[in-house]
Amino acid sequence: MKLNEVKEFVKELRGLSQEELAKRENELKKELFDLRFQAAAGQLEQTARLKEVKKQIARIKTVQSEVK
């Protein structure tokens, strides 16, 4: 993700409720699990997606802690 995309993503996250943030986090965790499984099986072609999903999860957790 480029800087502008990251800023838009975080801006979008800040507009969501705690429940929506938790739902989005769970979806990304499921995707991360699937990506790790594909990587272990040697089927993952977009290895950078692992890093991107981890960062998105961290951003969601940061926004959640800002609200608390």
Curated annotation (Swiss-Prot):
Family: Belongs to the universal ribosomal protein uL29 family.
NCBIfam families: L29
GO molecular function: structural constituent of ribosome
Name used for this protein in its record: Large ribosomal subunit protein uL29
Keyword Ribosomal protein applies: yes
Domain of life: Bacteria
GO CC, alphabetical: cytosolic large ribosomal subunit
